[in-house]
Amino acid sequence: MKLIEHYVALVKTGCAEYGQMNEMTLTEIADCLFCTERNAKLILHKLENSNWIIRESGAGRGRKSKIAFLRRPEELLLQTAKEYTMSGKLKKAKELLQQYQSAFPGLQNEYNMWLSEVFGFVTETGENGAKDVLRLFITPESVSSLDPCQIFLRSEGHFVKQIFDTLFTFDSDMQEPKPHLVHGWEEVGKKQWRFFLRKGVLFHNGQPLTSRDVAFTFQRFLELADNPYKWLLHGVKQVLEKGPYCVELILDKPNALLPYALCDERLSILPAEQGGGKNGTGPFQMNQQHSGMLVLEANERYFKGRPYLDRVEFVFSEQAGEMNGFTIQEKQTCPEQQTVFDERHVQYLSLNLKKKGPLQHRSFRKALRLLISSERLVREAGGHRRIPVTSFLHPSPFEWEGVSPSELLKKSGYEGETIVLYTFSETDHREDAEWIQNICAQHGIRLTLQFCDAADLRRPEIVQMADIIHDSATFYQDSEFGFLHLLLSENSFLYQHLSEKLTQICSGMTERMFSMPDRCSRINILRDIDRQMIQELNAIPLYQNVLQVTSSKNVKGLVLDEEGWIDLYSVWLSK
């Protein structure tokens, strides 16, 4: 039993009135706490040290001690639940409140009211005046790495964007790069690019951004042995500083996509002085990161203008997925409004054609495609699942000729071998995987599920153990680069699962793309790759999500970034 539980038990047994002396023998106390008299003395000592009781020991064996109970149990239970919550122990807080729900019926409501006041969008007043704070729960693995070229999860990309900046950003309306840390650039021939940096941009530690930092960042990016994104600097062989505010890239082959690549957060600019680190030029700077919390503070000197938020606190909790991270309220009670965002994240299955087994037979893969109906999955699983898809890029659905799955399974020679599907442990992944498992079982396919954390799914040996991996791909703003990441990033599940034939096709066709200045021509090549991949059944696209954001009407500037997270830079609270 925990100290709070000991206290509640003693109050129930021996408290006639709070603050007044109540008589109990040590034997009665030990019986109440289900422990020895020796342990009862230790517990009483701890309660005294916590200032929860005052005790006067009785003289002689069997004499009654006098105990004054100073705190009401419901106050302490609520305080303990709050402490658990702020340290990310949501499950413990929930279990504690449920344990005493019948004894203290109003406790859960008080906790819920407190939770709505301190989480979400709140205004807090302290020594330095009023501060607008956004406080959310996230899982600890959401920020396993804040090194831009080690990003694996969308959440990591989101945090990197808050702390760092890139030379360009992608204009989703114009579908082209626009200057960010640069104010201009020029292409000299087809193998030489010059970029001209803005003056007056400062890192969070006050040091100015110069060409040295850009050169350091790109050189580090090219030289890191375990960087899975080297294709982003395709053809770059030399990075030169041409004065304090000019950087020149020398290529050994044309790369028409270079300005687009320089929008990617994996090429965020790091300070040369510190050899990297978490000191960026972005709109927020890291105040602290430890096992319980990540805190971002507004960058007062941000070159694009200070964020409206003063501070953002992310409380780590393994149960964060059970909380609605997109419910943003303010402390004052306001009518709610609901904003729905379509999300260009495509949920899909990557089929491992490098592994021996039933998936090597195209008839078996085709049977799976027919059984795992995107329309049926969206209809039956519901929730955030919105638009069934049959490809990554093609607007029109792929049609399959009318062969029954049972005939295809028979043709493939399938004899009940076990197929293993790996995916993340979050609820939406579990729901999809269990739905797929049930469909397969109905048709005699033995499918087992392995739910993993991100750290395991980063490991190439785990990826190759899987027959199938369930994941989602980001296509929110730039569908061209979203698909290229699937095809070329070495930590992409699809990249690691592609058949030898498709690997060669992708390599040849994407190599041609880099020399094409016309975006429409490049998209057509990607659609051709998409078509061949779907026909070869190396991947099974499933559906697009819809994200729902609920907020009070006083929360303004709600925009989701391409990772599906709230754009922290633009959101604000109207008083």
Swiss-Prot record:
Where in the numbering of this chain does the HTH marR-type domain appear? 1-120
Out of the domains of life, which is the source?
Bacteria
Q: Where is this region: Solute-binding region?
A: 176-490
Q: Which InterPro entries match?
A: SBP_5, SBP_5_dom, SgrR_HTH_N
Q: Which residues bind DNA?
A: 26-49
Q: Which CDD domains match?
A: PBP2_SgrR_like
A Gene Ontology biological process term: peptide transport
Its keywords, alphabetically, are:
DNA-binding
Q: Which Pfam families match?
A: SBP_bac_5 (PF00496), SgrR_N (PF12793)
Q: Which family does it belong to?
A: In the C-terminal section; belongs to the bacterial solute-binding protein 5 family.
Kindly provide the name given to this protein in its UniProt entry. Uncharacterized protein YhjP
Q: Which organism is it from?
A: Bacillus subtilis (strain 168)
Q: What is the lineage of its organism?
A: Bacteria, Bacillati, Bacillota, Bacilli, Bacillales
